[in-house]
From Swiss-Prot:
Species in which this protein is naturally found: Christiangramia forsetii (strain DSM 17595 / CGMCC 1.15422 / KT0803)
Name of the protein: Large ribosomal subunit protein uL30
GO cellular component: cytosolic large ribosomal subunit
The keyword Transmembrane appears for this protein: no
PANTHER family in alphabetical order: LARGE RIBOSOMAL SUBUNIT PROTEIN UL30M, MITOCHONDRIAL RIBOSOMAL PROTEIN L30
Length: 60
């Protein structure tokens, strides 16, 4: 199973409550913050919900 790096690139201001909760669940609070997660269907689903606010990179 791979890993992905998720970086917050846009603000959560004026976003829906669900999008804010997803960002919090991913561990993203500040713009430019990067977290590493396992490449699981749960994480990929959360990333898909906020794909316009984050950038994603695959890591080894």
């Amino acid at each position: 199973m791979g890993k992905i790096k998720v970086t917050k690139v846009k603000s959560a201001i004026n976003r829906t409550k669900n999008q804010k909760l997803v960002l919090e669940s991913l561990g993203l609070k500040k713009i430019g913050q990067t977290v590493e997660h396992d490449d699981t269907p749960n994480i990929l689903g959360m990333v898909n919900k906020v794909k316009h606010l984050v950038s994603v990179e695959e890591t080894k």
